[in-house]
Design a protein with these regions (language model features):
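Signature aromatic-anchored transmembrane alpha helix within multi-pass, membrane-resident enzymes
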Residues: 237-249, 395, 401-433
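Membrane-embedded helix bundles of polyisoprenyl
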Residues: 23, 112-131, 135-221, 240-247, ...
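Hydrophobic alpha-helical membrane-interfacial segments at the cytosolic entry of transmembrane helices
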Residues: 15-24, 190-191, 229-256, 272-277, ...
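Membrane-lumen/periplasm interface segments of specific transmembrane helices
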Residues: 241-274, 279-300
Length: 570
């Protein structure tokens, strides 16, 4: 282990640039034709990608226009801290400064989606290289982390796909300590802080992982130091303390608005009922997303038995799993590292099961995280831990690929080993592909990329605050995206929980326009109500029991703007 610690590999800047370019090209190819439809199409579906496009746009808008009121977004007006109703992707704020309007928001989301994939590949590659994998085997690690089949279902969850900061932070910290470079250590904590700013779904995992690794390192140093064999340069200790304080400060600052939301909105808390709903059975690890080229149809019978498919399809990939098992025996990694990665993957898989309210599932270890450790009560989906499971498997898969190629090299020479390396990389990539055979009438269809609905031309420039109807979930998602044209304050919004205030407001306006609903909206300060006649009524809207009234009798000015019926409340 000591010899391995002293043998940090040479990684040239040229190598990093080439791998980054290759990762970007691979992202474009695997998710083609998305790159040909930037700004008009969006990955996977018209669900969460629309409000997440709005989130990044708001981040840039808020930084430029109201930095002291960053979390006071235009959704769910007049509620406070409404940006903190879900992971806010604050780490992407610089991207939000570029461009304006719905088209720019969708272009931005499409590019960030591809960027997240490429960064995950690059991060796992660099970490595998630092651990001792040769370049081509590290490429297998990059593909295994970025292309794991379960990630195909996360196309609408940019905060989950954006995991590249985790391996990059670990790479910088490990390399900084091995090469005794204080700047690299601080850089590692800076990247960890950026990952935290993308959302607590993954940031919390990384924070606890760093605490665990720090504790292991401290124990190792204490045991080795008892014999006087280990001395730590002061500058490394200072860099670690400074970096740790930076990460802690960023985490605390980001947590404050979320804590205020929990205090103001008890319905935002992740109850045991909610967590158990998104926890899953063991079979979810053999359920691949429907969009998986290799495993989508093969695992459909298992997938159909799951209650929350987007959160419970956690299949890591058969090729990745077999390579990871082989990697447990690769001597290029020191034995403690191999054992640690294997144990870590198993422990995380167990934690990913979450827990159930009753029965034997109520004793699963995730309950300990939920009940005893700070932060975990804010996590809705235990399966998000699959990100770290996949990283551990990817690093072991690099070892398995290196072991297989070495065996071929000793028997059949270098050419066979090269072919083996390329074949294994291709196998992992194909297994994680989202192309579909005979999908939607196409012989070979690309990863789903629906066209984004455009805003009606009469929507821009209306007096705010406003309410848009109907207000079904899918409607509110598109309203948020359309609101990036000026960010008018509005009652509508979309988040991971349903604010009690909004439910009350929808009940109060069920009969709009009538005297009670108009009086309610005027008391709030709403100035405009927009009815989208081109959209179907919300089937879940509260029923009207009294009937509406003529607008002129209520002091309303009604105008028609194409498909929009606009009511000016005065």
């Amino acid at each position: 282990m000591a010899a391995w610690w002293r043998s940090s590999p040479q990684i040239r800047g040229r190598e990093v640039v080439l791998v980054a370019l290759a990762a970007a090209l691979l992202a474009v190819v695997l998710f083609w034709p998305l790159a040909a439809h930037l700004g008009t199409d969006i990955p996977l579906d018209l669900g969460d990608p629309l409000p997440q496009s709005w989130q990044v746009a708001w981040d840039g808008h808020a930084l430029a226009t109201q930095p002291l009121g960053f979390f006071q977004s235009n959704q769910f007006w007049p509620l406070h801290d409404s940006l903190a109703f879900s992971d806010a992707l604050i780490g992407y704020t610089p991207a939000g400064l570029i461009g304006h309007g719905p088209h720019a928001a969708v272009v931005r989301y499409d590019l960030l989606f591809l960027f997240a994939f490429a960064l995950a590949f690059l991060g796992a590659y660099l970490l595998a290289r630092e651990l001792g994998a040769p370049p081509w085997a590290a490429a297998v690690a990059g593909a295994a982390f970025a292309c794991a089949p379960w990630r195909l279902e996360q196309g609408g969850h940019l905060h989950v796909l954006s995991s590249g900061g985790i391996p990059i932070a670990l790479f910088l910290l490990l390399r900084g300590w091995r090469r005794e470079r204080a700047g690299m250590i601080v850089g590692g904590f800076a990247v960890a802080s950026w990952q935290m700013a993308l959302g607590f779904s993954l940031g919390l995992q990384l924070g606890y992982l760093l605490l665990l690794l720090g504790a292991i390192a401290a124990i190792w140093w204490w045991r080795a130091g008892r014999g006087g064999r280990v001395g730590i340069p002061r500058r490394l200790i200072v860099a670690t303390i400074v970096g740790g304080l930076l990460l802690t400060a960023v985490s605390l600052v980001l947590a404050r608005p979320y804590m205020r939301v929990l205090d103001a909105h008890p319905e935002a808390k992740r109850s045991q009922v909610t967590v158990s709903r998104y926890s899953g059975p063991l079979r979810m690890f053999v359920a691949a997303p429907e969009t998986s080229l290799v495993w989508g149809r093969a695992t459909s019978s298992v997938r159909d038995t799951l209650d929350a498919v987007p959160e419970q399809t956690l299949f890591p990939g058969l090729a990745i799993l077999l390579l990871a098992i082989a990697g447990l025996g690769w001597t290029g990694y020191p034995r403690p590292l191999r054992v640690g990665l294997g144990a870590f993957a198993l422990a995380l898989a167990l934690l990913s099961l979450g827990f159930q309210e009753h029965g034997i599932g109520s004793f699963l270890p995730y309950r300990l995280l939920y009940e005893a450790l700070p932060g975990w009560q804010g996590i809705r989906v235990p399966g998000r831990l699959n990100t770290l499971t996949t990283l551990a498997l990817a690093l072991l898969a690099a070892g398995g690929a290196a072991r297989a190629a070495a065996a071929l090299r000793s028997r059949r020479g270098g050419s066979a080993a090269t072919v083996c390396a390329a074949a294994l990389l291709l196998l992992v990539v194909i297994e994680g592909s989202g192309f579909g055979i005979d999908r939607g009438g196409e012989a070979l269809a690309g990863y789903p990329h629906p066209t984004v609905p455009t805003a009606p031309p009469g929507l821009a420039g209306l007096r705010a605050p406003l309410l848009q109807l109907p207000a079904a979930r899918e409607d509110n998602r598109r309203y948020l995206l359309w609101s990036t044209d000026g960010f008018p304050k509005m009652l509508n919004g979309r988040t991971s929980f349903d604010p009690t205030f909004f439910a009350h407001a929808m009940k109060a306006v069920a009969c709009f326009p009538d005297r009670a609903s108009v009086a309610f909206l005027r008391r709030l300060g709403v100035r405009t109500v927009v009815v989208h006649s081109e959209l179907p009524p919300d089937p879940e809207a509260p029923a009207c029991t009294t009937g509406s009234a003529a607008p002129e009798k209520l002091g309303l000015q009604r105008t028609r703007r194409g498909p929009l019926v606009v009511y000016d409340l005065g």
